Design a protein with these regions (language model features):
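N-terminal acidic, glycine/proline-rich low-complexity segments
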Residues: 1-255
């Protein structure tokens, strides 16, 4: 990829683009917002959705997290009344920076990326541990000239640590992607995206009672926030939406 192609790839796209989404959808409540936003944006053509691994209190391990995310993707698609190609991702994190974890998601990205070129790349929106994307790059490094990666991960460069959930789960994968030469747009969490939040009054005003999907998003978010902040005037960061929003940020209308 020459410098002109790289600069163009790092700029917000100016028209309709093809997108794949890599998501740990069951991890918490924000991936569902991001998936819904992507599917409902006419300028973004969703070509595939990949289930990403995660491990926290909502899963018994990375593979369980990936499988639960796979199921959650279909749940959201059903509420949307939409269909999409959905692929299971890595059952484990990278063992090192040289060994891919082969999965249907990584194989699809390797195959699909070949249909694109530097002047018309495939946009890869990643909102979880970036294992699937790193694995695809390790399996076929030539795809780095054909994709643009927008990742929600890490913290702002002036933040006091880098112990961010998506990054710390698979540091090797983050190193692979960042060092691969693929055009890479980072949406840092604390210090940047942490400003993007919603509240119970906003959720109830804009979503409650509108449709089954809106009710699901509203209920999920309120229940999650009330589990630790009941009785207070809370707000909840909906991190993952920003990675999709970057693709729609023409003329700096959002950021």
């Amino acid at each position: 990829m020459n410098s002109n192609d790289l600069l163009r790839a790092l700029s917000v796209p100016q028209g309709p683009v093809d997108v794949v989404l890599d998501t740990d959808t069951y991890n918490e409540i924000d991936d569902q917002f991001a998936l819904s936003y992507l599917m409902r944006s006419p300028e973004l053509h969703t070509k595939a959705i990949y289930a990403a691994p995660f491990f926290n209190e909502n899963s018994s391990g990375p593979e369980d997290g990936m499988l639960k995310s796979y199921d959650e993707i279909f749940k959201v698609l059903k509420l949307l009344g939409e269909r999409a190609e959905v692929y299971k991702g890595s059952p484990a994190y990278l063992p090192d920076e040289h060994t891919p974890v082969v999965s249907p998601a990584a194989e699809d990205l390797c195959r699909r990326a070949k249909e694109y070129r530097p002047e018309r790349p495939l946009y890869v929106v990643a909102i979880g541990a970036i294992t699937n994307i790193a694995s695809a790059i390790l399996m076929d490094p030539s795809i780095t000239d054909r994709i643009v990666v927008a990742w929600l991960g890490g913290h702002g460069l002036d933040f006091h640590d880098t112990k961010e959930f998506n990054l710390i789960q698979d540091v090797a994968a983050a190193r692979v992607v960042m060092g691969s030469g693929a055009p890479f747009v980072q949406l840092p969490c604390y210090g940047v995206v942490s400003a993007f939040s919603t509240s119970r009054p906003e959720l109830e005003y804009w979503l409650k009672g509108k449709n089954p999907l809106a009710d699901y998003l509203c209920r999920n978010t309120i229940e999650a926030a009330e589990s630790y902040a009941a009785g207070t005037a809370w707000s909840r960061i909906i991190w993952d939406v920003t990675a999709v929003a970057w693709l729609l940020n023409r003329d700096d209308r959002f950021m």
